[in-house]
Amino acid sequence: MRSKSVVVLDYGSGNLWSVQRALQRVGAAVEVTADSAAGAAADGLLVPGVGAFEACMAGLRKIAGERTIAERIVAGRPVLGVCVGMQILFARGVEFGVETTGCRQWPGVVTRLDAPVVPHMGWNVVDSASGSALFKGLDAGVRFYFVHSYAAQRWEGSSKALLTWATHQVPFLAAVEEGPLVATQFHPEKSGDAGATLLSNWLGEL
């Protein structure tokens, strides 16, 4: 049986090579590229992201990545967003008083965590959604690795979406699963065995 093909979208942001290695370790055939045709053709598309929402959206638009994501979703083809790659899937992001339009796959806004200590950095427990395909086989109270100052702190989308929450003084969305579009605020590639299981689960859905 052939390995599932995954494109890690290279738009100038994200831990590209650590994501690539993590996917390869669970059996994926991985290509890191900015090429939209490759992104459209792969079994799965992973959208990484670190840094500022505005800069990530600018980089994504330079390579027509926003369109690639949208076309895959319309066609029912899997997309996984990680960290800021999750945040930019929402309609808006607000950083330092500046509002930036996101990919608008989900309604809502990404804002600075309303917590006394940011960034939120380190291991944290997640409360995974019942029936989640991403978290299949993982125990309750499983920990993942986070590095972020911003997050979606409420959900305004479909009631059919599966929502996984975490708390850093305040609750925020740690993962969302809605049809072919899934995303994690944490870094599965930095989350050891739990992250490997999650990535393997995603590959199994491709």
UniProtKB/Swiss-Prot annotation:
Stored InterPro entries? Class_I_gatase-like, GATASE, Imidazole-glycPsynth_HisH
Q: In which pathway does it act?
A: Amino-acid biosynthesis; L-histidine biosynthesis; L-histidine from 5-phospho-alpha-D-ribose 1-diphosphate: step 5/9
Output one GO BP term: L-histidine biosynthetic process
Chemical reaction(s) catalysed: 5-[(5-phospho-1-deoxy-D-ribulos-1-ylimino)methylamino]-1-(5-phospho-beta-D-ribosyl)imidazole-4-carboxamide + L-glutamine = D-erythro-1-(imidazol-4-yl)glycerol 3-phosphate + 5-amino-1-(5-phospho-beta-D-ribosyl)imidazole-4-carboxamide + L-glutamate + H(+); L-glutamine + H2O = L-glutamate + NH4(+)
Compartments where located? Cytoplasm
Q: Which GO terms describe its molecular function?
A: glutaminase activity; imidazoleglycerol-phosphate synthase activity; lyase activity
Chief subcellular location:
cytoplasm
Bilayer-spanning residue ranges: none
Q: Which residues form the Glutamine amidotransferase type-1 domain?
A: 5-206
Q: Name one Pfam family in it.
A: GATase
Q: Name one GO cellular component term.
A: cytoplasm
Its EC number is: 4.3.2.10, 3.5.1.2
> Catalytic positions?
83, 187, 189
The cross-references to CDD domains, in alphabetical order and at most eight, read: GATase1_IGP_Synthase
**Keywords for the protein's UniProt record, in alphabetical order:** Amino-acid biosynthesis, Cytoplasm, Glutamine amidotransferase, Histidine biosynthesis, Hydrolase, Lyase
Quaternary form?
Heterodimer of HisH and HisF.
Q: What does this protein do?
A: IGPS catalyzes the conversion of PRFAR and glutamine to IGP, AICAR and glutamate. The HisH subunit catalyzes the hydrolysis of glutamine to glutamate and ammonia as part of the synthesis of IGP and AICAR. The resulting ammonia molecule is channeled to the active site of HisF.
What is this protein called in UniProt?
Imidazole glycerol phosphate synthase subunit HisH
